[in-house]
């Protein structure tokens, strides 16, 4: 509202006066600003509390290193590694194996340069075949592919030595040497393969002699392979005891 103010010079100057409502609105705006600042301060306090609590927890558990400090609380952590793939292990009791012992041989005619195959006992005394290993018709049959240790000991015995310059009439009764061969027969190979061979001279041996030949080694075999033992003179093989002449194989 406007009022006239006299200045003493005969003139009146109008003065603009603020109404009462405007003063109330200015005071209201000032109070609202003060309350907003108070609410903001309270909100900051409430938000900072969980942050401070989390930092305190990290410090207590040793997960946060304080700059300038070399010490930190030790923590015990349990490491759990994922299980790694392990090769399949077959217990020895489940692996194919066989141990054959000698039996009395029946001499059969064969070619001059051909080695006779021995017959074996497979289920009496010390002899056995286990876990699908099979013996049939002089052959030890391999049931599954793998690395096998094959062994054999053949003991020869004689009563006279007929080597050197002995007459040809008696010479065919006794050879100059004795030979043992472990042979593999496979369907995938056209001819028998000699795996192991052992030879000894008997010319220097006097009467009533015994001479063992042992063979043994590891071979990679396929399912269906057949093994046999051949000798140069089947009539000289000692079959009196099963611990003198034997033949066997087992999967490693």
From Swiss-Prot:
THD domain ranges (all copies): 96-252
Highest taxon of source: Eukaryota
Main subcellular location of this protein, as a coarse class: membrane
InterPro entries given in the database record: TNF, TNF_dom, Tumour_necrosis_fac-like_dom
Membrane topology, from the record: Single-pass type II membrane protein
PANTHER family the record matches: TUMOR NECROSIS FACTOR FAMILY MEMBER, TUMOR NECROSIS FACTOR LIGAND SUPERFAMILY MEMBER 15
Family named by the database record: Belongs to the tumor necrosis factor family.
Entry protein name: Tumor necrosis factor ligand superfamily member 15
Organism classification: Eukaryota, Metazoa, Chordata, Craniata, Vertebrata
